[in-house]
């Protein structure tokens, strides 16, 4: 079978050329020492071990490091030095020639972006059937990465997009979507032309040229392909060409009895490995499928099911913790790269040092987030971007150094929260205006001024100059010690950023600053930082590294379907049938590769070792996962038991046990009894004494860091301000003209909005402002009608202070009206809740299950049963005015969402008996507050109405150790 049907590259076929010989290394023994021994065959230790004329091809860079270590150990055992061989991964066999003007990644991205933004979409409807919402630089850059990825995939066989069209020339096979590939080829042609205009060549084009015209590296006399079960197809083309000049040895990590399971290049044969049973410990004896070789091995592989990624990581950490010195005794394989962050976190929590040889993407580093925040402020200083920068630890450290003793992190962050929640600023300019109104020397005002200066610096010059100046300003006062791990990492990241900026600056001629930032950040975030391996640390090895792990105990996490075997699903351009046709690595070849790796790492631990395979039931996002299909490779008789084993319920780990609080919290007692309480505070105490304590005594309350619109309190305050202005304005006091009143209220509302939020409003605020206009417009009609009937506002926003139960109760009465003819008085409170509620229903509730904890003083026996006071607002207003207006009525002026329900609703049934009961309740509440009685809590508050719900998962009583409580 040909590796590739295309004649242009003339890729080698199996069997391999005569000068390519296979050799087998026993998989019962560790691979690296065997390889070192094989490579040094014939060396007697008389001189240094000289392998410098040897080229060794290994699957990964980490396996290359393992090989060099093994060679050094072998030479050192005889007290000799070693000259290491040249070690390459398969893709390096046809790397682009340095003498060619190969384009950098920024240059390639920008060339594609230019082509995509200049093209006429009508010419490429097979590729772009729908028009983009905006053909912006961001859109083009995302697509550029997609096309570079497609080029890289085709580059595995040394092809370009136009080469795919050659498949349509033969009658034996029809190329699917030929018009689409023709348009893709035209786009690639324009891309190549764009690079040529700049004196550059695409990296994949250069690699394809190198694969077609290979030259044996100078000084190399022999090539060894070592335990590489999945080489790139184009690398085999290069090796076949090399084989005409020098010998090539293929070292297969398997016994010679498995020779028929591999092709001439040492690749597992799909027809063999897809039928190879894999034994599990505790399973029935393995019955081979028809025609498959017998598998008479006692498995050392144990399978454990875990609920989720954290459970897998905890189990792996527990296995490693069983060794006093795990390095060298236990190996950890990570088949699913998505598990790496949680693995590192859990192992760190357990104080087990780990090392990820693949490194970490810089997108997770503090410098990347600082740069991203600077870029956002430079591009468009929205307040969300300002907040992101303001909360960066490096920026906070800068403010501390810049402002000195005047700076407080708490004041800075809490001030930003107050600014967002109180003023909803849209951008930096409006935030500075509002902060300045609070005080020019406030921490927030000074900090925002520093951000404004950084924004000016960033916009003043080029990307390179602006970024360097901004970072220089931020870190100017910081002393770095490169012996400290954190400082050394920051310095390394800064060097990497400088290199990226230099590349982008050289390539990004004509780009706007914001586009340059986007390009540089995208490239910087994708770069990888590699660290030195800490002494004694456990390596977190990728799946392809596991053949080289020689620890007797190996634990592999994430062996779920889709990860092992690795699967390609839903490729937009290269479906599985096309991949197989052109010789790309397919799902079938990956299945064979991974089946072989699993079998080899199990065989390597027979006779005293152990292999633990950990599977997840769900992903980090909660999506269900299936066990790897490799674990279902067994005979028909065993299949039911195997399914039961792999799909059983996962064992409970420590984190899966039902949550319970480790200890109950002990809140501090009040420093001194409260002397004042707001009218609304009594309502809060009646709802829950303990939550009153949290809010009114400790001053606790939630902060919404994502607040984008007014909450109910903000909306009510806004409407109140407009209505208060109407009541206080001399011209409006006696006005009975509804349009005039409506116009005044709209003006007063607009003035209040500008005062609080500025002239530039976010969209949600604009919508809420329109709702307020509609409600106030209807209120103007009601007000005009009431005035025509003889009612006038006597006083607005009257302050009250009354002594009850040894406490001073304070508040504000929204308005007091008097009738011109009758002299009757009414006390009204504005209500802007979405639904209009009658005063009685707002103050009293029928006794029931949810009121079982109500105090006796809050109860009222009525003809319709026992009622419970839940609010005392209107009764307290009447009590405050009792001497001045003993016959006053009370009620609400409702301004609900349904403007048709707008109107004045009096408490018609209010009586002296109700008032006396309300005052008894007020005396009881104030006495309880004065005595520090804030227990027990109410546990029947709906979670969506409870601002402290997140603190008490099983209720407040189960979470709090209250003083003197049972």
Language-model segments: residues:
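Polyanion-engaging groove/track-forming segments
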Residues: 1-733, 746-759, 767, 787-791, ...
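RecB-family 4Fe-4S metal-dependent nuclease core
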Residues: 660-966
């Amino acid at each position: 079978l040909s590796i590739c049907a295309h004649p242009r590259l003339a890729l080698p076929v199996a069997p391999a050329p005569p000068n390519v010989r296979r050799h087998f290394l026993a998989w019962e023994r560790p691979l690296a020492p065997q390889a070192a021994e094989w490579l040094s065959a014939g060396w007697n230790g008389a001189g240094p071990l000289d392998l410098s004329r040897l080229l060794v091809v290994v699957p990964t860079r980490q396996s290359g490091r393992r090989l060099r270590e093994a060679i050094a150990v072998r030479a050192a055992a005889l007290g000799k030095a070693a000259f290491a061989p040249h070690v390459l991964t398969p893709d390096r066999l046809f790397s682009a020639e340095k003498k060619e003007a190969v384009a950098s990644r920024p240059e390639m991205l920008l060339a594609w972006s230019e082509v995509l933004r200049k093209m006429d979409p009508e010419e490429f409807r097979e590729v772009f059937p729908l028009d983009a919402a905006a053909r912006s630089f961001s859109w083009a850059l995302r697509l550029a990465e997609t096309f570079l990825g497609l080029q890289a995939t085709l580059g595995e066989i040394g092809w370009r997009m136009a080469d795919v069209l050659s498949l349509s020339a033969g009658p034996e096979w029809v190329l699917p979507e030929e018009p689409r590939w023709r348009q893709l080829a035209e786009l690639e042609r324009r891309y190549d032309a764009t690079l040529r205009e700049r004196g550059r060549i695409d990296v994949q084009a250069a690699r394809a040229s190198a694969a077609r015209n290979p030259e044996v590296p100078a000084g190399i006399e022999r090539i060894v392909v070592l335990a590489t079960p999945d080489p790139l197809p184009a690398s085999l083309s290069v090796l076949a060409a090399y084989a005409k000049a020098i010998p090539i040895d293929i070292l297969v990590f398997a016994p010679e009895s498995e020779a028929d399971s591999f092709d001439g290049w040492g690749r597992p044969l799909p027809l063999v490995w897809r039928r190879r049973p894999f034994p599990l410990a505790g399973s029935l004896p393995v019955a081979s499928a028809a025609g498959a070789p017998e598998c008479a091995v006692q498995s050392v592989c144990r399978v454990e099911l875990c609920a989720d990624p954290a459970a897998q990581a905890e189990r792996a950490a527990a296995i490693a913790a069983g060794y006093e010195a795990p390095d060298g005794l236990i190996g950890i394989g990570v088949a699913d790269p998505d598990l790496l962050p949680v693995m590192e976190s859990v192992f760190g929590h357990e104080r087990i040092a780990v090392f990820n040889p693949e490194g970490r993407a810089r997108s997770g580093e503090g410098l990347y987030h600082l740069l991203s925040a600077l870029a956002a402020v430079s591009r468009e200083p929205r307040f969300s971007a300002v907040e992101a920068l303001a909360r960066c630890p490096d920026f906070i450290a800068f403010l501390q150094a810049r402002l000195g003793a005047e700076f407080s992190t708490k004041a800075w962050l809490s001030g930003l929260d107050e600014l967002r929640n109180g003023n909803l600023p849209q951008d930096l300019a409006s935030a500075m205006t509002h902060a300045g109104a609070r005080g020019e020397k406030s921490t927030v005002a000074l900090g925002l001024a520093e951000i404004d200066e950084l924004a000016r610096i960033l916009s003043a010059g080029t990307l390179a100059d602006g970024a360097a100046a901004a970072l220089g300003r931020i870190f100017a006062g910081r002393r770095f010690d490169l012996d400290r791990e954190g400082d050394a990492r920051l310095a390394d990241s800064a060097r990497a950023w400088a290199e990226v900026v230099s590349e982008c600056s050289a390539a990004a001629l004509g780009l706007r600053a914001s586009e340059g930032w986007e390009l540089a950040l995208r490239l910087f975030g994708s770069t990888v930082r590699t660290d030195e391996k800490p002494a004694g640390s456990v390596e977190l090895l990728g799946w392809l590294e596991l053949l080289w792990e020689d620890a007797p105990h190996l634990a592999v996490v994430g062996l779920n379907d889709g990860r092992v075997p690795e699967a390609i699903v839903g490729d937009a351009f290269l479906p599985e049938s096309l991949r197989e046709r052109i010789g790309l690595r397919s799902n079938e070849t990956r299945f064979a590769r991974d089946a072989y790796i699993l079998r080899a790492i199990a065989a390597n631990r027979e006779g005293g070792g152990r292999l633990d395979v950990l599977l997840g039931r769900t992903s980090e996002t909660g999506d269900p996962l299936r066990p790897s299909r490799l674990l279902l490779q067994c005979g028909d008789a065993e299949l039911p038991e195997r399914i039961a084993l792999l799909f059983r319920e996962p064992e409970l780990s420590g984190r899966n046990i039902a949550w319970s609080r480790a200890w109950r919290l002990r809140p501090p007692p009040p420093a001194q009894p409260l002397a004042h309480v707001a009218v609304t505070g009594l309502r809060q105490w009646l709802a829950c004494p303990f939550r009153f304590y949290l809010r009114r005594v400790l001053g606790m309350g939630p902060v919404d860091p994502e607040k984008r619109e007014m909450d109910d309190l903000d909306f009510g305050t806004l409407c109140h301000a407009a209505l208060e202005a109407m009541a206080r304005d001399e011209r409006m006091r006696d006005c009975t003209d509804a349009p005039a009143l409506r116009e005044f209220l709209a003006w007063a509302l607009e003035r209040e909005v500008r005062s609080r939020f500025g002239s530039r409003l976010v969209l949600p605020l604009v919508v809420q402002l329109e709702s307020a206009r509609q409600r106030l417009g209807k209120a103007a009609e009601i007000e005009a009608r009431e005035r025509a009937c003889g009612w006038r506002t006597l006083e607005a926003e009257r302050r009250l202070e009354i002594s009850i139960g040894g406490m001073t109760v304070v508040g504000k009465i929204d308005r007091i009206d008097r009738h011109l003819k009758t002299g009757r008085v009414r006390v009204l409170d504005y209500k802007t809740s979405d639904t209009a509620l009658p005063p009685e229903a707002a103050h009293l509730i029928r006794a029931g299950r949810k009121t079982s904890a109500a105090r006796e003083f809050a109860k009222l026996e009525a003809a319709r049963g026992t009622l419970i006071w839940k609010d005392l607002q209107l009764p307290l207003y009447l009590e405050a005015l009792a001497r001045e207006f003993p016959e006053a009525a009370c009620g609400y002026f409702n301004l609900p969402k349904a403007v048709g329900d707008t109107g004045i609703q009096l408490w018609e049934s209010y009586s002296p008996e109700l008032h006396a009961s309300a005052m008894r309740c007020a005396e009881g509440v104030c006495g309880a507050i004065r005595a520090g009685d804030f227990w027990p809590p109410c546990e029947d508050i709906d979670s969506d109405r409870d601002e402290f719900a997140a603190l008490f998962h099983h209720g407040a009583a189960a979470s709090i150790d209250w003083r003197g409580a049972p």
